[in-house]
Amino acid sequence: MQTLFLRKGLSGHTMAAIFIHDLIPNVLSAVLPDTSGFSVIDANRKAACCQGCFRCWLASPGQCVMKDDLQTVGAQIGTCKKVIILSRCCYGGFSPGVKKVLDRAISLSLPFFTYRSGRVHHPLRYQNRPTLTVCFYGAVTDFERETAMRLVEANRVNMGFSSVQVYFAEKPELMAEVIKNR
């Protein structure tokens, strides 16, 4: 099975769901056999890391200036109904590829400051508030599980998700039912 990376324009049209994953193709087909209704983002695909230049805030608001498959990932997340992330748990965080995708979504926010949940954050660029489901796989210690839960909650607040659910499993294939029901 070939993974297709769908790019969404900035037309304001809302995607139903975005599925961000770090799986190899045969495992992806076992977890998500039917990708219709999803914009699938393969975190293993070659794409540049965020350079921290903030030109997505200033030079091309809402869009990364690096012209690759992650150029509009912030707009995709900001205008969809739900985001599902399936990632190997790495020391209580996302895998490097999934983290790269989330780093490139910095254009979800604006270059100003505001208070949310009693803390200083950047205001959000989009009014839409998608739901977030995160499925971590791999052998995870209690400390890594606790760290991952805190990280995902911080991402929920910072990226403007309306709600979050987090799941853990030894193998990604065990998440197929969770993803199917999201």
Q: Could you say what each language-model-derived stretch is?
A:
Residues 115, 168-174:
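A short, well-structured beta->alpha microelement
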Residues 19-24, 137-140, 168-170:
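Structural motif
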Residues 37-40, 163-168:
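A structural preference for short, hydrophobic beta-strand core positions in alpha/beta folds
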Residues 13-18, 82-84, 126-135, 162-166:
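Hydrophobic beta-strand segments of well-ordered beta-sheets in folded domains
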Residues 112-162:
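Short, glycine-/small-residue-rich phosphate/pyrophosphate-handling segment
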Residues 1-83, 87-110, 157, 174-182:
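N-terminal beta1-alpha1-beta2 submodule of the flavodoxin-like/Rossmannoid cofactor-binding fold
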